[in-house]
C-alpha cells in the first residue's frame, strides 16, 4: 500500500521527502533553545536557537526558518544561497547567520518589542541528510512598573480613612502590593489600564482610624514583580493633623516659702505646631509672683502661703486646648524628727557592743596572765610570805609547800642550819 501511495505522488515531492528522511544508522542532531525568553516592552530581545551536531557527523544546513504559532507563513527565513527574508525587515534580524558560513546559529533578534509579540515561536533547521529539526520558544513580554508611595494627610475623623497611597504604574503583568504596619489598618487595592497598551497600574491604599498616636509613625509598601530581582520597599511617614494635647509639669507637691524660684512647663503636642501659649488662673490674671515666659511659668519666692490653680491654654491652626494644675506654697518644710536618726542609733549600739566585747576579751587575758604570774612568784619566794606573816602576827607560821619546792630548797636549809 505504501508503494501504491508513493507511485501516486509527484516525483518532486518524493524527492523532498527522501531528503527529509534520515538514512539508517545516522546520529541524531539536536536543536538547543530555552523554553521561555523574557523581553521588556519597547526594548529588543534575542530568541536564541542553536543546532548541536554530535561527533563527526556530517550535516549540511540549507535553510533557517522562524514562524509563530497561529499564523500562516514564516516571519523570518535565511537560505544558504539567497540570504535572509523577513516579514518585518525593520524589526527582525538574524544575529549570526551569514552567507558563506555554516548555518548552525539561527538566533533571531526582535526590535521594538510590543505586547502583541508575546507568544509561542518555532525555530526550524532544514538539514541534509538528517532532515528538519525544530524547537518551540515562548516569548514573554514584560513591562517594568514604576513605583511611588505618598502620605495622605488627614485630620481626626473618628472613622477609617486612607492615610498612605502606593502606586505601581505600567506593569506587565500587574505588580503585587502588600503593606507592613504595626499600627493596625487594612489595604484597599485596585487596578486600572496603564498608559501603554497591555500594561496595568495598581493602586493600594492603607486605611485606618487616624489619631495623634499615629502621627509621625511609618508604614511600608512592598511591591513585587517578575522584572524585579528583589521586592521594592517604600516607607511612608504618616501625617495626622490634630489640636493641642496639653499637660503641665514641674510641680512636685513640695513647694515652701523658703525655697528658690520654681518653674512650671506647659507641655503641648499638636500638628501643626502650637502658635501660642496663654497662662492664667481660675481667679483671672496671673498673680505678681508668677511670670509667663512662653511655654514656661516662673514662680518667684513668696512671703506667705498660697493655693492657686494655674491654667495653660495652647492654640494651633486647628483649635485650642488647656490644662490646669493647683499649686500650694506652704510655710516651711516638715521638721526633722527630734533625736538621732535610727541609722545613727544602730551604729552606736553596734559600736558599744563591739567595744564591750573587746574589753571583755582584754580583761580575760589580763586576769589569766596575772594568775600565772602570782603562782610563779608564790612558788619561788615562800620565805618572804612567811616572814611577812610572822612580822604581822608576832609569831612564825609555816606554810605548806610542794615537794618540788621543798626538794629544791633542802640544800640551802641544811647549809643555814
From Swiss-Prot:
The keyword Disulfide bond applies. The modification Phosphotyrosine is found at residue 398. Pfam families: C2-set_2 (PF08205), V-set (PF07686). Residues 145-237, 244-328 form the Ig-like C2-type domain. Residues 368-417 are cytoplasmic. Mediates NK cell adhesion and triggers NK cell effector functions. Binds two different NK cell receptors: CD96 and CD226. These interactions accumulates at the cell-cell contact site, leading to the formation of a mature immunological synapse between NK cell and target cell. This may trigger adhesion and secretion of lytic granules and IFN-gamma and activate cytotoxicity of activated NK cells. May also promote NK cell-target cell modular exchange, and PVR transfer to the NK cell. Contains 1 copy of a cytoplasmic motif that is referred to as the immunoreceptor tyrosine-based inhibitor motif (ITIM). The phosphorylated ITIM motif can bind the SH2 domain of several SH2-containing phosphatases. Belongs to the nectin family. This is Poliovirus receptor homolog. It comes from Chlorocebus aethiops.
